[in-house]
């Protein structure tokens, strides 16, 4: 699903369209639980709670707690470039690999770029994809299908996100033409 939101910045209303981060993360965690992973780990940046993407963290944690599954939040991804993030991902991979050597590790990564980095690190160490790992990305970006092995990913309907964003922009532009413009109504939740 998609979420439309409106925020006020210096008395200006700005709308945003985003995917349903909570539902996507819930689906990812549920898949890893269903596939009998011994421990679930979510790899992400330390996202502020006010950002819609924080719902990925919240849903992952809620789902693991609901099903009483051991889990870890690794919110240590930082960096301003691919190289910086890849270097950080090496540390994260090493930590996970050393901490859970005899466990099936279900890794939910915040996006498909992170998932591809993690997949490459697994292959660099093991030369294959061992049964002790399962990865899920988020975005359904081309990198997920073009990786050394296709990556399971939570799909975002980019075409629908774009269409909804354009509709909101047109609606705002039409409203501004009026003598007394009215800001858009409350945020709406769109399911697809």
Question: What residue ranges belong to the model's regions?
Answer:
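Flexible loop/turn connectors
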Residues: 94-190
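Short beta-strand/turn micro-motifs composed of small residues
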Residues: 6, 18, 44, 109, ...
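Hydrophobic alpha-helical segments within soluble ligand-binding/sensing domains
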Residues: 16-42, 85-94, 115, 156-174
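Short beta-strand elements in bilobed, periplasmic/extracellular small-molecule ligand-binding domains
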Residues: 63-83
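Conserved beta-strand scaffold positions in the cores of enzyme catalytic domains, especially
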Residues: 14-16, 42, 74-76, 135, ...
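Short, small-residue-biased leader/transition segments that mark boundaries at the very start
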Residues: 1-9
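An alpha-beta-alpha
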Residues: 26-69, 181-190
């Amino acid at each position: 699903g998609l979420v439309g939101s409106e925020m006020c910045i210096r008395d200006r209303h700005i709308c945003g369209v985003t995917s349903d981060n909570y539902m996507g993360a819930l689906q990812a965690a549920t898949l890893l639980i269903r596939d009998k992973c011994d421990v679930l780990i979510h790899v992400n940046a330390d996202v502020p709670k006010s950002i819609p993407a924080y719902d990925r963290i919240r849903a992952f944690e809620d789902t693991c707690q609901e099903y009483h599954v051991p889990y870890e939040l690794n919110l240590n991804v930082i960096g301003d470039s691919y190289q910086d993030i890849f270097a950080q991902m090496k540390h994260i991979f090493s930590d996970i690999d050393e901490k859970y050597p005899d466990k099936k590790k279900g890794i939910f990564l915040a996006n498909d770029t992170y998932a591809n980095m993690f997949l490459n690190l697994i292959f660099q160490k093991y030369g294959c994809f061992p049964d002790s790992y399962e990865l899920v990305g988020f975005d359904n970006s081309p990198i997920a299908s073009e990786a050394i092995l296709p990556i399971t990913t939570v799909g975002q309907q980019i075409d629908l996100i774009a269409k909804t964003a354009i509709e909101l922009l047109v609606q705002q532009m039409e409203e501004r033409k009026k003598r007394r413009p009215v800001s858009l109504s409350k945020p709406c939740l769109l399911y697809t």
